[in-house]
Amino acid sequence: MRLLLFSGVFLAFVAPTVQQCVDSDGACSSWVASDRGACQRKEYIKKNCRKSCGNCPIYEAKFDTRRLNPQLQPIRQLVGRWKGEHTGKVTFPTIPTFKYSEEVEISIPDGANIRSLNYTAAAWSSDKEDLHRESGYITIKPNTREVILTTVMSNGFITVEEGPMFGNNIKFILKDIGRISFVRDEHLHNLVREWTLDQGYLRARLSIQTLSHRMQEHTSILYTKTSV
């Protein structure tokens, strides 16, 4: 059996506010106009004169939750770019245990009426070898707390996963799976993907069951949010 390596992702659904870039001291504009270098030399000005110093973060439109379709508001905390650098672990009876890194991007599509989030994930080994990629969509079943994830994977699998949202957590359970005819991985019988958001960190765990092995943890990883 070769590496399946599906991304895992449990979360807190607290509505965030988009941070405004402003000066907290009314004298900032005068200070900076008379001495531009003060933005680098003086800690007080650097901290309290962000607008005048031009130290405002750049918000990418695809991560700006003010653009989010109302139906998707309960999962707004998923939106962003998440990276786990050497924080992933792969285990399964048929392969050696090893560490990996992964970047997940969950973004808002351009169309205002599109009721799903774009999802991509890319994993690589400690020596930068490409291990696994997948892409798909995340949405919510109308008038429920059921979250749906669809994926197309670089190893030839296609999945439909659904699960309830409880507080900080989503637990996706495999509902349907497709595979190309010549894929050599062992037949996947079941899959459970768990995502948890904990104070700005995204913890992920994926458990799988094959025809010859019971349900057990296959991958786990801790992501840090890298987008603004």
Spans of features found by a protein language model:
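Generic beta-strand structural signal
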Residues: 77, 140-142, 165, 197, ...
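Amphipathic/hydrophobic helical signal segments and adjacent flexible N-terminal regions
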Residues: 2-6, 54-116, 122, 127, ...
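Mixed-charge, glycine-accented linear interaction segment located at domain edges/termini
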Residues: 182-228
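Compact disulfide-stabilized, cysteine-rich extracellular microdomains and processed peptide cores
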Residues: 2, 8, 12-62
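Short amphipathic alpha-helical molecular recognition features
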Residues: 37-41, 74, 130
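Central antiparallel beta-sheet cores of small beta-barrel/beta-sandwich binding domains
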Residues: 92-183
